[in-house]
Amino acid sequence: MPTPKAFTLLGPTACGKTALALKIAETLPVEIISLDSALLYTGMDIGTAKPSASERAFVPHHLIDIITPVQTYSAARFVEDCTRLTGEITARGKCPLIVGGTMMYFRALTQGLNDLPEADACLRADLDEQKQMYGLDFLYRTLQKVDPETACRLKPNDSQRIGRALEVYYLTGRPMSAHLNGQPEHTLPFELYTAALIPEDRARLHENIALRFHLMLEQGFIGEVENLRRRYPGLTADSPAIRCVGYRQAWEHLDGATDRQTFIEKGIAATRQLAKRQLTWLRKTPLDCVADPFSDGTSGTRLIEAAKRFFGE
């Protein structure tokens, strides 16, 4: 049996990945595998710009609406699900198309997973108690002592990752940086073609981000977050689902921490920061094909032709 193939379309938020994926679907018999951690959650449709019902009816989508906002998902599970789906889609005679911008998942898929321990509920509760008693700064200073390399690359207010790094250290006796630096060689079980949309006009991307954020507000984004608060009492501002861009800022606004205008400004700024991080990842990622979505209108055609050649169509 021939080795399965998958075509990956990467890019920062608001650069037109979904629209291009649908154009590819008009040309090739694809099924889309979402590479977007925000699309995993049910009930989070507006703020994630989730593909519409008609778009999902036009072409099958996978790894969308598979967990609730109080459940968790990991890079390890993504690798497992993506590998399984690639085989299943290929067996159906279709072409797997991986689309998104969660670069941590893509890195796990292409470079392999580290042998890190599973989350430990008791230890996590202990760390949460320390944070409540002494503050997040105390945990960050502790991390600086036991794993300065990881502490250096994390922001002092990144509660989730600081807690995870300390958890790894306490469970294994080794800093997370040592685990990451000792990563073994990794081989993908399928052939992968990696294309990316990388806009050179940063101002145009920022304009798209602002326009999309305002459109989300018109579509009822605040109401969506209010519904999440009612439906899932266990959700907090630190929950992984609420850490998705826009949701954290909306949550703070509904808590009364910001007025509407400040919320909008912070939401747009957070989305711009996400795009900046995604572009930084992409510039470090080996790519088979790069196109500027805002150039001359031919970038989409070039990527569609690249996909057709890759799949032998």
From Swiss-Prot:
Keyword Iron attached = no
Q: What positions does the entry give for ATP binding?
A: 11-18
Which residue ranges are recorded for the region named Interaction with substrate tRNA? 36-39, 160-164, 243-248
Site positions (Interaction with substrate tRNA) are 102, 124
Q: Which residues form a coiled coil?
A: none
SUBUNIT field: Monomer.
Q: What is this protein called?
A: tRNA dimethylallyltransferase
